[in-house]
């Protein structure tokens, strides 16, 4: 047995997960995921790589509860996502999962300040935006991602790399069980990408968060503890 897996509990499990889409003109189903099984240990940084159309984005969507598989089981910790109602699934994503997307437009709300963007998940969960603990957590995370003193500005005043660092801070603000990152460095220059990848790796090694990153970039994948390769909807 792999020692790395044996000493840690599972943060994420997929068992025989398949995702099939509706028939196209050819009359055949499109199989985006084909009987995928894997276990991601708690506190690890895992990269999922593969060419365009390999199924890696569908893997992330099913693993994060953004899409329901056609068959198979997905668990976050001990929670089977298949048994959850849409409302319960929304609460789980809000409370136990953090997200970092490739698009800055998806990551941040331009009408909110940088600090308000960071603490937004806490506010959506019912915290008062002006509460001392909420503000302190937001400022502490901005300091950690190298943006101390910038919280009062708008995200549009930041570079793409700085916006992604804000997105990482927001993903961590709820102290999630799992952070899912979808091509988080795809539009960044090498220096900015390195900063973002360092923050994700630090979240796993320092905080014990489980990070699952989808990427087409082998350099980015090299920052992870484990690399899963997808091709044709299957893990290779």
PLM segments and residue spans:
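Short coil-to-helix segment of the ABC ATPase nucleotide-binding domain corresponding to the Q-loop/switch region
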Residues: 110-120
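Conserved ABC transporter NBD signature motif
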Residues: 72-80
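Helix N-cap at the start of a conserved alpha-helix in ABC-type nucleotide-binding domains
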Residues: 190-192
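Conserved ABC ATPase signature
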Residues: 154-158, 162
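ABC ATPase NBD coupling module
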Residues: 81-98
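Conserved catalytic motifs of ABC-family nucleotide-binding domains
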Residues: 175
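Catalytic Walker B motif of ABC-type/P-loop ATPase nucleotide-binding domains
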Residues: 179-182
């Amino acid at each position: 047995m792999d020692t790395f897996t044996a000493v840690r509990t599972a943060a994420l499990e997929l068992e025989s997960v398949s995702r099939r889409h509706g028939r196209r003109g050819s009359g055949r189903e499109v199989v985006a995921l084909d009987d995928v099984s894997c276990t991601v240990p708690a506190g690890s940084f895992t990269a999922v790589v593969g060419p365009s159309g390999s199924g890696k984005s569908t893997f992330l969507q099913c693993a994060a509860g953004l899409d329901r598989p056609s068959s198979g089981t997905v668990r976050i910790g001990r929670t089977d996502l298949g048994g959850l109602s849409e409302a319960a699934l929304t609460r789980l994503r809000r409370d136990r999962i953090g997200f970092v997307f490739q698009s800055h437009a998806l990551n941040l709300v331009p009408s909110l300040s940088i600090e308000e963007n960071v603490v937004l998940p806490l506010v959506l969960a019912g915290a008062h935006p002006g509460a001392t603990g909420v503000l302190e957590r937001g400022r502490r995370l901005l300091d950690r991602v190298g943006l101390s003193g910038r919280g009062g500005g708008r995200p549009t005043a930041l570079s793409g790399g700085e916006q992604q660092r804000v997105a990482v801070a927001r993903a961590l603000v709820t102290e999630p069980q799992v952070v899912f990152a979808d091509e988080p460095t795809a539009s960044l220059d090498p220096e900015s990408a390195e900063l973002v990848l360092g923050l994700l790796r630090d979240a796993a090694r320092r905080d014990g968060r489980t990070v699952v990153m989808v990427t087409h970039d082998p350099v980015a994948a090299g920052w992870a503890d484990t690399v899963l390769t997808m091709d044709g909807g299957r893990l290779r």
